[in-house]
Amino acid sequence: MAVAIPDRARQGRAMNLIEPSLLPASTDIARHHHREPYATVVLAGSYEEAGDAGRIAVCEGEVLFHGPFSAHRDRISPKRTVVLDLPLPFDGRDWPARAQLADPGRIVRLAERDPVEAVAALLDEFAPVPAAEANDLPDQLSATLRASVAPRIGEWAVVRGRSREHVSRSFEKLYGVSPAAYRADCQAKRAWRMIVASDASLAGIAIEAGYADQAHMTRAVTRLTGMSPRRWRIGTA
């Protein structure tokens, strides 16, 4: 679809909420973090994202959802790729990773007039897309590391006839982060979502999220978000 692009150079994947952005073609954007949740509507072209939901290829008419504190690496295709980033509610809901829109142009038009209405329409009209089966070893490992109880990386590798070093190198090449760091990041986000979305005890959440104790969870969540679990509880009360 044809969209008007602001006349300014874009040297990287800088966030440009509300108005369409032209992504730099054939570019590999290193893993980076976003504190605020947002949705990316692909208006033209395509790109691949490797992040919190695994490795996902998206094209025109599709949407990627990113929760708070998301982290990912992007590979932009050689095609002219245009996206629209829209803010999402800052809460603990678990967004679908990928979705489709029947009429992305309508969301663009709404965003020009009323960004709040555009976000409301997006949330009302998107259709979740089921996750594709992970065929490559790094993507299989990503799915395993996102699980609530993830095995040791070395043990996982041996079962598949690989060394831990081989698996770690392959994973980091695609995801821009080591498997151990990726697992810790996903675990902290999972704990944070439970903290803000439920009234369960913090000690109970720590156990459910796979931490040895509440102190370990507190350090991980504080490192990820900049606030302790207790402060998040006070803020969402």
Identify what each model region corresponds to.
Residues 116, 120-165, 177, 181-201:
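A short, Lys/Arg-enriched amphipathic alpha-helix from helix-turn-helix/homeodomain DNA-binding modules
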Residues 173-214, 218, 224-227, 234-237:
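Terminal helix-turn-helix DNA-binding modules in bacterial transcription factors
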Residues 2-98:
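N-terminal regulatory/effector-sensing and dimerization cores
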Residues 72-74, 179, 229:
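Short clusters of hydrophobic/aromatic residues that line enzyme substrate/ligand-binding pockets
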Residues 93-121:
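Aromatic/histidine-rich interaction motifs
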Residues 61, 66, 167, 211, ...:
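Conserved active-site tyrosine of GNAT-family acetyltransferases
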Residues 155-158, 169, 173, 207-208:
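Alpha-helical residues within the helix-turn-helix
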